[in-house]
């Protein structure tokens, strides 16, 4: 019925069974097709992930909106279809003006976009260095990426930055064939639709992470539709894509490498449906649990000198960006230090 992520008081609830979500007094009730019921205390819920057919009414929506709880929807093929987000509770007109100002000013936009790429490419390099030190010969890929990174400071437009980012990722993805112990024949990233096991796996875990980043943005005063590296769009929360780039090597890629190298995911984990590769339900649940466990992993922050989770690192990144936008402190993207 449920797959519950996380170990803290507030949790993500992944709903794999068809059914109904409804408000019952001051709690949430899930009723499946067999009329089995489970009550979910509202204070336990961070967000809902609907991986099935689900019914709910405006009474339920109004109730979860009071608590700022989003719902993320996935289709039969485990493709993300969208999110319901309550009305923003943390609003700052001053910050919104500054966000837009830093987008419309090309120099200010490039400065932020470049820093996203600096962080992402550094963390990619650290991943390669990590596996190079564990018996994988990745020196050639490391040298190529290091050479490309040297030119980032010279770039003065977003399109060229995206070009460098694409070239760095192309080299990085070529190295996956060495990092992963299975025969994966991974040549390039294909998204719409993903055409093989690796692309399907990347798409699913990326999407899980995008929604988590969006949730962290929502807890701050940032507007998730105003972005700097990715072009803002009428149909996506593009700032979550920007911030995700910095953390994907640590959270998404490391998780995928672990799942594949432990043979928790193989070609048998997928079902072919027409031109799509669909994750089996039990495999999807496994990935969700491993993903949530990774987000809850604790490290000691080098500057704060206190223990925080990987997920909270994302919130800190939002706060750092806010300080930059308000002119308090120049934004420096997250870079792995361990």
From Swiss-Prot:
Gene3D superfamilies: CRISPR-associated endonuclease Cas1, C-terminal domain (1.20.120.920), CRISPR-associated endonuclease Cas1, N-terminal domain (3.100.10.20)
Binding site for Mn(2+): 165, 230, 245
EC id: 3.1.-.-
Keyword set includes Glycoprotein: no
InterPro entries in the record: CRISPR-assoc_Cas1, CRISPR-assoc_Cas1_C, CRISPR-assoc_Cas1_HMARI/TNEAP, CRISPR-assoc_Cas1_N
GO molecular function: DNA binding; DNA endonuclease activity; metal ion binding
GO annotation terms (biological process): defense response to virus; maintenance of CRISPR repeat elements
Disulfide cross-links: none
Coiled coil: none
The entry's keywords: Antiviral defense, DNA-binding, Endonuclease, Hydrolase, Magnesium, Manganese, Metal-binding, Nuclease
Entry keyword rRNA-binding: no
Cofactors required: Mg(2+); Mn(2+)
Family: Belongs to the CRISPR-associated endonuclease Cas1 family.
Subunit and partners: Homodimer, forms a heterotetramer with a Cas2 homodimer.
Function recorded in the entry: CRISPR (clustered regularly interspaced short palindromic repeat), is an adaptive immune system that provides protection against mobile genetic elements (viruses, transposable elements and conjugative plasmids). CRISPR clusters contain spacers, sequences complementary to antecedent mobile elements, and target invading nucleic acids. CRISPR clusters are transcribed and processed into CRISPR RNA (crRNA). Acts as a dsDNA endonuclease. Involved in the integration of spacer DNA into the CRISPR cassette.
Protein known as: CRISPR-associated endonuclease Cas1
Taxonomic lineage of the native organism: Bacteria, Fusobacteriati, Fusobacteriota, Fusobacteriia, Fusobacteriales
């Amino acid at each position: 019925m449920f797959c519950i992520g996380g170990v803290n008081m507030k949790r993500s609830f992944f709903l794999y069974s068809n059914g109904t979500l409804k408000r019952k007094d001051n709690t949430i009730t899930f009723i499946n097709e067999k009329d089995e019921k489970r009550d979910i205390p509202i204070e336990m819920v961070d967000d809902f992930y609907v991986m099935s057919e689900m019914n709910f009414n405006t009474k339920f929506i109004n109730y979860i909106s009071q608590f700022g709880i989003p719902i993320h929807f996935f289709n039969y093929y485990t493709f993300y279809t969208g999110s319901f987000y309550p009305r923003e509770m943390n609003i700052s007109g001053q910050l919104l003006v500054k966000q837009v100002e830093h987008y419309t000013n090309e120099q200010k936009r490039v400065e932020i976009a470049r820093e996203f790429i600096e962080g992402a490419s550094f963390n990619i390099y650290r991943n390669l260095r990590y596996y190079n030190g564990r018996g994988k010969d990745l020196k050639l890929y490391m040298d190529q990426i290091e050479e490309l990174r040297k030119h980032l400071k010279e770039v003065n437009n977003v399109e060229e930055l995206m070009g460098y980012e694409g070239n760095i990722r192309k080299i990085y993805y070529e190295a996956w064939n060495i990092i992963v112990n299975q025969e994966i024949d991974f040549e390039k990233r294909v998204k719409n639709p993903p055409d093989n096991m690796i692309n399907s796996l990347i798409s699913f875990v990326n999407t899980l992470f995008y929604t988590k980043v969006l949730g962290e943005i929502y807890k701050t005063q940032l507007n998730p539709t105003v972005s700097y590296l990715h072009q803002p769009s009428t149909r996506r929360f593009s700032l979550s894509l920007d911030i995700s780039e910095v953390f994907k090597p640590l959270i998404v890629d490391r998780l995928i490498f672990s799942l594949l190298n432990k043979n928790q995911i193989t070609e048998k984990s997928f079902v072919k449906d027409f031109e799509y590769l669909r994750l089996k339900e039990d495999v999807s649940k496994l990935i969700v649990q491993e993903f949530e466990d990774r987000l809850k992993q604790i490290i000691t922050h080098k500057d704060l000198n206190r223990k925080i989770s990987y997920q909270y690192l994302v919130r800190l990144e939002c706060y750092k960006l806010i300080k930059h936008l308000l002119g308090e402190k120049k934004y420096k993207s997250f870079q792995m230090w361990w």
